[in-house]
């Protein structure tokens, strides 16, 4: 059995959403309750948002929390 690996795509989603909505790092951070520096680090994949932020981010980004993850390799049906 091959175990799948997961790649978090939250960085791309945040950056695209911010750009499409003409929001600054500071404005987007304010929507979630974090600093502009935190958002910048998320977008650059320096670090990831705490799991407690994922449901709120999903609502803001109009997606599900599952959309933040992509499965690579393995059999997703196993």
List the predicted regions and their residue ranges.
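Key DNA-contacting residues within the recognition helix of helix-turn-helix
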Residues: 15, 40-41, 50, 69
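Short, charged recognition helix plus adjacent turn
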Residues: 4, 69-78
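DNA major-groove recognition helix of helix-turn-helix/homeodomain DNA-binding modules
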Residues: 52-67
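Alpha-helical residues within the helix-turn-helix
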Residues: 19, 30, 59
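Short alpha-helical DNA-recognition segment
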Residues: 22-41
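A short, Lys/Arg-rich alpha-helix, primarily the initiator
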Residues: 1-20
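Residue-level detection of the helix-turn-helix DNA-binding "recognition helix"
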Residues: 19, 33, 44-46, 73
